[in-house]
Amino acid sequence: MNYSSNWALRLLTIFLIIGAFNITNAQNLKGVVTDTSGALLENVGIFNQTSGQHSHTNLSGLFSLPSSQINDSIYFSNLGYKTFVLVVNQNHLSEGVEVILEESSINLDQVVVVSKVDAMSRIVNVDIQNDPVKSSQEILRKVPGLLIGQHAGGGKAEQIFLRGFDIDHGTDVAISVDGMPVNMVSHAHGQGYADLHFVIPETIDNINFGKGPYYADKGDFNTAGFVDLNLKKSIDKSMLSYEAGQFNTNRFVGLFNILESSKSDAYIASELYLTDGPFHSPQNFNRINILGRYHYKDIGKEELTLTASHFQSKWDASGQIPQRAIDQGIIGRFGAIDDTEGGQTSRTNLMLNHTKFLGEDQFLKTRAFVSKYDFELFSNFTFFLEDPVNGDQIRQYEDRTIMGAETIFEQIDIPVGTDDRFKYSAGLGFRHDNVDDVSLAHTLNRKTILEQYAFGDIDETNIYSFINGEYTTGNWTFNPSVRLDYFKFDYENKLSEAYDNKSESKAIVSPKLNTIYTFNRNWQMFLKTGLGFHSNDARVVTANEGQEILPKAYGLDLGTIIKPTDKMVLNATLWGLLLNQEFVYVGDAGIVEPSGKTRRVGVELGGRYQLSDWLYLYSDVNYTYARSTEEADGEDYIPLAPDFTAVGGLSITDLGNFSGNLNYRYLGDRAANEDNSIVAEGYFVTDLNLNYEIKNWTIGLIVENLFDTEWNETQFATESRLFNETASVEEIHFTPGTPFYLRGKVAVTF
C-alpha cells in the first residue's frame, strides 16, 4: 500500500512538473514585422506550425502569438514578400523579435489559410496583383461569381450580377471606397445605384469583399454581399501613361508623388478618358477624374488620411435595341432606334480616415465623408409605345448631398486562459442623404419636358451601431455579432398643389454568427449564418405607408478553403439565401412593384495554381437556383437571374521583360421573364493584355474580345413599338457587347 501510494505520488508529481514546465515555457512571442526599408507591415499572417496558433500584425506592424515555445516554427506571410520561417529560441521569447520580410513577386506561396472570415479576399488579391485592372468597375469582376455589364454609352453605372441576383446597378451589394459608400439610396434611376467611375484604377491598392449578410459592419445593401476598394495611401514613384486605340479612344493618366517624408506622404492622380465607342452614332464619351491624397503616420500614436476627389463625365448612347429591328434590316447591331439617349454626372468627395492608437492592442478608428453628386440621364426603352408621335424618351434627374461618419473601437488581443484569445470591435455611425428635385419626366430630344411623371425631394437618414466579437480556442474561431439599423424616410411630392410630405421610420436588429475550424495553416472550413435586410427606396416606403419597410434576408454559407500544396488553393461553398416580401421602385416608370418572396441556393467552386514563378492560373465556377416561392411552378423564374457563370484566366509575370494576362468570362442563358418563354442569351468572351518593360518604360497592348465574339452585354425583356408598327411586341432588347477592341499603351515611371 505504501509503495503504491508513493509511486502514485511520484507519478502525480512528475505530471505536475511537466504541466508547470509547459505553462512556464509556453509564452507569448511578441515582435514587429518590417520590410527591408524599415517600413512597418500591417496584416502580415503569422502561423505557429507546431502549436497551430495564429495571429496578424496590427496597424503598427506589431504582433503577439500565444503558446509559443523554443524550437517552434513560425511562418510569416504577406503578399508581395518572401515567406519567412522563424525557429523560436529563448532570446525571442524573453526579448521579442524583429522580422524583416524581403520583397518578391506575388505568388500563392505567400497566402496562409487561417481562421479569417475574409480569407478569400486575401487569395483574390493575388489575382489582382497578377492582373491589374483597366477600369474601376472592372475590379468588381475580381469578386468570384460577380459579372457586370454596361448599357448606356459608358457613363452609367454597370449592371451587376451576383449569386442569382440581377442586382441592377447595386441594389443588393454594398460597395464602398475606403469605407465611403458608393451606393445611392432612393436614386433617380433605381435603388442602390453604384457608380464607381470616380475611382482611378491605378490608385487601387486592394479589394476586400464578402458574400451574404454575415458582416456586422455592413448594413444597407449587403444582401448578396459587399465590396470595399482600398486606395493606395502612398505611391513609390510618379507615373505618366497614355493609351490610344480603336473607336477614337484616348486615355491619359498621371500619378505624381508630391510629398515623401518619414511621417507624411502625398500624391495627386488624374485621368482623362475619351472614346466614341463601336456604335454607328458616336458616344462622344468623356470622363475627367482628379484625386489628391495626404497620409500621415506617427508610429504607435495615430494615422491620418485625407482624400479629395472630383469626377465628371458626359456621353451619348444608342440605347437598348430590339432584335426584330435588326432582323428586318432597319438597323445593324451597333445602330440605334433613338440615338439622342445619353447623360451627364459628377461627384465630388472629401474623406477623412483617422486611427488613434490607445495602446498596443487598442485602436479608435474614425472616418467621415461628404459628397456632392448630380445625375441626369435620358433613355428610351419603349420607343413609340406610349407616345406614337413624340416617342417615349424619359429624363431622370437628381441633385444630391451625402454626409456620414463612423467611429469604431477595436481591442484585438485579449488573453483568455493560456491559449485562447478574444477580440472585439464596437461601432457607431450615420449616413444622411439630401436629394433635391429627384424627377422622372417625359421629354423630347433632350430639350423639351412634355410631362412630369414624378418630382420631389428626399431626405433619408440611417443611424447604426454594431458589436463584433471573435473568440479563438484551439482550432475553432467563433465570430458572433449583431447590428442595429434605424432608418428615417421623408419624401415631399412636389407635383402636388398642396404641401405633400410623407415620413416613415423603422429599426431592425440583424444578428450574425460565423464559425471557422482551422485544420492547419493551409486548410479551413467555415459555417456562416446571418440575418440582413433588403434595402428599400424612400418612395416605396412612403407609398406603402411603412409596410414591409425592411424585408428580412436569411443567409447560410457552408464551405472550405484548402491549400493542398504551396502552389495551389481550392475553395468550395454551398449557400442559401431567403428574401421576404419586398417592394421595388421602378425608376424608369415611376411605379412601385411587389416582387414577392424569393429563394436562392447555389454552389461555388474555385481554384488557383502557381504553375511556376512566372505563370499563374485561376478559375471560378458558380451555379445558382433562384426562384420565387409564391408563384406556380414554371412561372416562378426570377427575370435575368444568372444560374451558371464562370471566370478564369492565366497571368504571366516577370518572364524576362514580359508580363500579360489572358482572361475569360462566361454567363449562361437565363430566363428574361417569369415563365422562361423569353431567354437572354449567354456569352463567352476573352480578353488579352500584354506588357513589355524597358527600364522605367512600359509598352502595352490591350485587346478586349480577342476572338471578336458577337455577344449581348445587357438584355431585357421589354414591350416596345417601333414607329412603323401598329402593335407592340415584347421581346429581348439588348446592348451589343464590345467587338474586337485594340488599344496600345505606353507608360513611364520617374
Model-identified regions with their sequence ranges:
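Short, acidic, small-residue-rich periplasmic hinge/interaction motif at the N-terminus
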Residues: V44-Q49, S77-Y81, H92-N130, Q137, ...
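Face-selective signature of the C-terminal outer-membrane beta-barrel domain
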Residues: G300-F311, G343-K494, N522, P564, ...
